[in-house]
Amino acid sequence: MEDMLSFFSSGLHVMLVDDDTKNTRTATKTLSMLHCPVVSTHTTACAGLRTLSGDNMLDVQTVLCDVSKVVSSGFDFRRVNETEHQIPVIYLLSTTEPEQMVAGEDAEFLNHLLLKATYILRKPLDWATIALWRVVAWHRCCLEERVPGDSMDDIAAHAGAGGEDGNDDDVVVIEEPQVHFKLVRSRGSRKRQLTINVDSGSSDSADANQRKKIEHMNDAKGPVGQHVASHLQLPAQEYCTKQQKDLDERRLISSDSLFLKAIFPTLNVSPSSPLILAGGAVPTAFIPRVGMTVNIGKAPMIELPFGVPVDDFLVGETAYGGAGPSIGAPSNDAAVAYAYTGALNNNTAVGSLMAPPIDEPTFTLTDPIVGTKGEGVVHIVITSEDQNALAAVEAGAPNNAEPFMMPDQVDLEEDIMFSLESLLGLDEDMIPMEDAGGEAAEGSLNIGEGGMEIGWDLDLDDILMNNTNEFAFLDDLAWIE
């Protein structure tokens, strides 16, 4: 008795929840003998919980409740009281078997309540066998100090989850799926709502939203998933840089000549430059021809058709005259300067786009060169009198059978070297224009009153380079008759 009074000086105050009147009277008498006065009795668990939650709450230190009343209420009465009020709940069990009390889903709920119970007493109570105060003292100590005991390992509910109005005293979160009710206080002005904490995590809402976005992106499949992943993982600046790089890169196509494929990687050419051969087909109305235009005092310019390999037209052709293909060119500049030939009109000097000469030319030109003189520009037209010979030669030349037939692809990674003589067409033996006799002299250029004639039979050693990177001819190489 002294030990009990050391814990409960005024005795152990008990609340009794039972609808059996006879058992209620018997239990009240027995508890009084054990210095455990009954301060309140209720017939339902909801009524008892309403009393404990009211403003004029009695000094109750433990609750004795018939387990059948808890089953009929539909919620775990013990867990709610021990979590919110730290009041131990002891179940009262009748002499009948639990399986005979309820059936179906209620039987499963009953087994759950008995398994998680703090303490169970059989009815009727026997004052000689029970030591109620020891059980209550120990369990209250565990609840107040939050020290989990063997029977408290399942208590994970916590109070203080803020409501909509920010009042933490009105909401208690309980991890129990059977708790689905609202408890109204006696004065009616404040409500206490019991909810279920379905989210055991305590992460921030922003982190949760970001995690949901990432999970949604990972779950998405197909084009939609790829689109979302690309926009989330690829910054805008990096995306624009990649697009610009793709636009700047220029790939060699099949219509490029062997010479352009070899030297193009070393050139810094803009994507919009006319040197970029877009691969368009030459109109069938225009037959690919070679035209030469000579300006007074300037080196002759060669007009090449667009999209046709250079080496197909320059087989046996040299920079400053000599053997060449017997392909006629129209004397009218308007017919020559169509859209495809204008691409290479205004580029570098003669021979800058000339392919290396072939050791064995397919055919040579034996007809004399006919020259005409005018006040402005002198046009030299390469013609052939024998058209049948021209047709025979063209039929026998495999490279000219198909104007757009391209040579084998060249690996751009290989080192291809071209000598200056090859680029200028000076590695072949030049035929001086005056060596052709009177006809050649008659067809040569007679410029000025003095009839100055320039011979084009030059060697590389006879050409000097001045500081302006231009060719300078020695004075003794040009003579006046």
Curated annotation (Swiss-Prot):
GO terms for biological process: cytokinin-activated signaling pathway; phosphorelay signal transduction system. Two-component system major event consists of a His-to-Asp phosphorelay between a sensor histidine kinase (HK) and a response regulator (RR). In plants, the His-to-Asp phosphorelay involves an additional intermediate named Histidine-containing phosphotransfer protein (HPt). This multistep phosphorelay consists of a His-Asp-His-Asp sequential transfer of a phosphate group between first a His and an Asp of the HK protein, followed by the transfer to a conserved His of the HPt protein and finally the transfer to an Asp in the receiver domain of the RR protein. Functions as a response regulator involved in His-to-Asp phosphorelay signal transduction system. Phosphorylation of the Asp residue in the receiver domain activates the ability of the protein to promote the transcription of target genes. May directly activate some type-A response regulators in response to cytokinins. InterPro entries: CheY-like_superfamily (IPR011006). The keyword Phosphoprotein applies. The keyword Phosphoprotein applies. This is Two-component response regulator ORR32. The gene is RR32. It comes from the Eukaryota. The modification 4-aspartylphosphate is found at D66.
